[in-house]
Amino acid sequence: MSPRQQPRRIARELALLSLSQIKGNPENLEQQTLNDLILVAVRTLTLEIQETLETAAAEISRGNERILASDTKATNLKSAQTMVKEAISLTHNAINRLGTVIDFPEIVQLSSQYEVREYALELIGTVYRRRAEIEQELTGALVDWQLHRLPRIDRDILQIAVAEMLYLDLPQKVAINEAIELAKRYSDDEGYRFINGVLRRVTNKLNESEKAVSTQS
């Protein structure tokens, strides 16, 4: 089984893409089928594709305006080139997301569906129930940032990782590595490096607290 098809890895992706749209109270979670989770995930990705393409179209339009004005100002041409490059990059990202939308349902079907559903719902429920404690840990590890100011996808990846470390008995190193993999797929280069740094500070503080408790006892 490829890493992408491992049930828990798929469950993390489902949880990440569903976290902002599914209420985590027990009554609601019990009613969620695997198909419900897949539908929410696909809708989330589709919305992101639409927003990315709209941004790319706006960049191309602005770049075209700068090119038309380039006869009078050389700086306009350079600025237009930058905008077009950004639009190409955004379009490339949207195409990658489209591939994920197409592949994701099949990948889920090829995995252990029961395990995927159970772990995805456990992650969503844990983040929902323990949000205050999780956010406290993350806030203490942020440097020159506020948690609510982070991009939603980065914030959700961080919350899932801390939930797994603190409440689902996932080893710290594994939780960090899995979070980085999620960030590489759904965030950007700056995002996954930022997430890596925050989670390492979280684990350092957790380990220091454990040592302090051991010393006192």
From Swiss-Prot:
Gene Ontology annotations for the cellular component aspect, listed alphabetically: cytosol
Highest taxon of the lineage: Bacteria
Record key words, sorted: RNA-binding, Transcription, Transcription antitermination, Transcription regulation
Keyword Transcription regulation among record annotations: yes
InterPro entries per the UniProt record, alphabetical: NusB-like_sf, NusB_fam, NusB_RsmB_TIM44
GO biological process: DNA-templated transcription termination; transcription antitermination
Entry's Gene Ontology molecular function annotations: RNA binding
HAMAP family: NusB
Homology family: Belongs to the NusB family.
Function: Involved in transcription antitermination. Required for transcription of ribosomal RNA (rRNA) genes. Binds specifically to the boxA antiterminator sequence of the ribosomal RNA (rrn) operons.
Protein name: Transcription antitermination protein NusB
UniProt organism field: Microcystis aeruginosa (strain NIES-843 / IAM M-2473)
UniProt gene name: nusB
